Design a protein with these regions (language model features):
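Acetyl-CoA-dependent GNAT
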Residues: 205-260
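Short hydrophobic/aromatic beta-strand or adjacent loop that forms the aromatic wall/cage
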Residues: 234-236, 337-344
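Conserved beta-strand segments that form the floor/walls of ligand-binding pockets within enzyme
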Residues: 238, 250, 264, 268, ...
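Conserved catalytic-core motifs of GNAT/GCN5-like acyltransferases
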Residues: 301, 319-335
């Protein structure tokens, strides 16, 4: 194991604005008290830990902050054991464990007292009611709460010099290397997760009226799938106000690698009609169509600098999964975009 503060450094690298449950999840697996049980919950008893982690990732909803933190913890410990612990053992004569634990204590204490957000984060974690915790394999909520309280006190009470082996430079390099590696690994697992979700498309559906009394969606095109281009079926609507066009919105039916970045819903509101929340309202009017096609979760993506579109997603209650780098094979990359906000909107 790497130590709780180092796990929090990794969590901050992955999601600097992540919710408090994500951070708690990122240390939760160490609430397992028995070392033999901890080896099992950390997959150390398995020949292939990577396969177990992949299987867990495919069962983990990207919108579940706590579970996402747990997954990150287990992935980081797997890489730490290989890149840090095992290398340490090779260089130590005799009993390595006590020396290893000492160096970990030094590095974790130093990180706590030399990271500007650490003290406040630990206080927030301790203050959160344990009833909000997610599930920690092998540990109770009481054990997790105790872990947080004990270690918050320990970090505050112990201000140590940096480790001479796990130096701040070593830790920074490890966090950056494994953090970037994890992000690419996790994005691929998220794509596989969404691609496994149910969808029901036999044909396009006609709806008599899609209106909330203020705006109306008028279907202008139903675009069949183009399998050779990996394009899914799509609806194209005009957003109308008093029978006059106010914008456009489209809905794509299905899940593909490309739609992870491109999203299921795209919208634009004509300039003279902006500022009235029409994009959000139009998205909500699509709900019966989304449900009719058996989809419970849709992705809405936007350029990471597009504040207005991001605000629309937030008003919908969509969950920001991550800011994802766009791969070179995607059309968005060819259009000059490099990062997309990936939002998940649950329509249950």
């Amino acid at each position: 194991m790497a130590g709780l503060m180092l796990h929090l450094l990794m969590a901050h690298k992955i999601k600097p604005k992540g919710g408090i449950l994500f951070y708690i999840g990122s240390i939760a697996p160490d609430a397992v008290a028995n070392w033999k049980d901890k080896d099992i919950t950390h997959f150390r008893n398995l020949t292939d830990r990577s396969e177990a982690l992949e299987n867990l990732a495919l069962q983990t909803s990207p919108s579940d902050d706590f579970a996402e933190g747990v997954l990150l913890h287990l992935y980081m410990d797997w890489r730490w054991d290989t890149l840090a612990r095992d290398e340490f053992i090779k260089k130590i004569d005799g009993d390595w464990f006590i020396k290893y634990r000492k160096e970990l204590s030094l590095s974790n204490s130093y990180a706590f007292h030399n990271t500007d957000w650490a003290k406040n984060l630990w206080e927030q974690m301790e203050l959160l009611d344990s009833s909000e915790y997610g599930k920690t394999p092998g540990a109770t909520v009481e054990e997790l709460k105790d872990l947080i309280c004990r270690n918050n006190k320990w970090h505050n009470d112990n201000n140590m010099e940096p480790s001479t082996y796990f130096t701040p430079e070593f830790i920074e390099k490890f966090i950056n290397q494994v953090g970037d590696e994890y992000t690419q690994w996790k994005i691929q697992r998220e794509i596989e997760y969404y691609n496994s979700l149910p969808v029901d498309f036999v044909d396009f559906i006609d709806f008599e009226k899609l209106s909330d009394g203020e705006i109306e969606l008028f279907c202008v095109a139903k675009k069949p799938a183009i399998p050779e281009k990996k394009w899914v079926p799509a609806y194209d609507f005009e957003i109308r106000k008093n029978n006059n066009r106010a914008g456009r919105i489209n809905l794509r039916i299905g899940y593909t690698d490309g739609l992870y970045y491109g999203g299921h819903i795209g919208y634009s509101v004509d300039e003279q009609h902006r500022g009235h929340g029409y994009a959000e309202k139009a998205c909500r009017l699509l709900t019966p169509i989304i449900k009719a096609h058996g989809m419970k979760k849709v992705l809405i993506t936007n350029n990471h600098t597009n504040i207005a579109s991001k605000r629309t997603c937030e008003k919908l209650g969509a969950k920001l999964i991550r800011i994802a780098p766009i791969p070179e094979w995607h059309d968005l990359y060819k259009d000059g975009q490099r990062f997309e906000n990936i939002f998940e909107w649950s329509v249950d």
